[in-house]
């Protein structure tokens, strides 16, 4: 149970692929103009990570070490192709919005890195959990950044959610404030860089506060030689 908890905590927070490892920044900065796009690409990446880790782990005993990387890339490409066809079939609007960034998941360092660092050494179910946790950590970072940019840039939240979830999701659209002059900086790539920098700063402050709190609550160590003295 402690290993499972550690995998989840590492993926979601301590070793977050976007906020700690700073991997996959190209789609993170390019696609997060809205919360819907960010959520769509994040969930697609999570599905690819989970299935890839599961497959790599299941085949690890029969994968020659000398050619393991090309095999991993073939597995990832196959999974990404399947996910791309699913999105094209059931969420065509989202497919058009994400464009080239769906097939580019194949080259994402997060996917190849987890296959090599974790899935090739652990069992299938732990590997699948690792992929899911890493993917959800990246999805969370994308969603927060996409939400901030959409709110500041358009004054809305979940605009176009029906392209991801279907027609019923139109009711999820929220107009937080009305503006005739959108805040363009938030919608452009420089705004994504600034938003990511602010998120990194907030995470650092939270980590430092948690570290200080643990240090204050930890029992003080008894100096050597002091035991038994009156």
From Swiss-Prot:
EC supergroup of this enzyme: translocase
Role this protein plays: Part of a membrane-bound complex that couples electron transfer with translocation of ions across the membrane. Required to maintain the reduced state of SoxR.
Subcellular location: Cell inner membrane
Documented EC number(s): 7.-.-.-
Subunit structure: The complex is composed of six subunits: RsxA, RsxB, RsxC, RsxD, RsxE and RsxG.
InterPro entries recorded: NqrDE/RnfAE (IPR003667), RnfE (IPR010968)
GO biological process, one term: electron transport chain
One of the record's GO cellular component terms: plasma membrane
Protein name: Ion-translocating oxidoreductase complex subunit E
Topology term for the membrane: Multi-pass membrane protein
Primary localisation category: membrane
Similarity remark: Belongs to the NqrDE/RnfAE family.
Gene name in the database record: rsxE
Membrane spanning residue stretches: 18-38, 39-59, 63-83, 86-106, 125-145, 182-202
Sorted UniProt keywords: Cell inner membrane, Cell membrane, Electron transport, Membrane, Translocase, Transmembrane, Transmembrane helix, Transport
């Amino acid at each position: 149970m402690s290993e499972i908890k550690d995998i989840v905590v590492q993926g979601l927070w301590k070793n977050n692929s976007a906020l700690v490892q700073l991997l996959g920044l190209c789609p993170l900065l390019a696609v997060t103009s809205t919360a819907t796009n960010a959520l769509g690409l994040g969930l697609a990446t999570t599905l690819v990570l989970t299935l890839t880790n599961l497959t790599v782990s299941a085949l690890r005993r029969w994968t020659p070490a000398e050619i393991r990387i090309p095999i991993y890339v073939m597995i990832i490409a196959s999974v990404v192709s399947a996910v791309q066809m699913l999105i094209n079939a059931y969420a065509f609007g989202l497919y058009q919005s994400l464009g080239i960034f769906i097939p580019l998941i194949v080259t994402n360092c997060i996917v190849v890195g987890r296959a090599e660092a974790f899935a090739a050494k652990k069992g299938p179910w732990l590997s699948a959990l690792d992929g899911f946790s890493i993917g959800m950590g990246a999805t969370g970072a994308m969603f927060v950044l996409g939400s901030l940019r959409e709110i500041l840039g358009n004054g809305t939240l979940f605009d176009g959610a029906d392209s991801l979830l279907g027609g019923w999701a139109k009711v999820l659209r929220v107009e937080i404030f009305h503006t005739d002059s959108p805040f363009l900086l938030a919608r452009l790539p420089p705004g994504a860089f600034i938003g990511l920098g602010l998120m990194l700063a907030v995470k650092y402050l939270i980590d430092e506060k948690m570290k200080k709190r643990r240090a204050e609550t930890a029992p003080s160590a008894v100096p050597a030689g002091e035991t038994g003295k009156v």
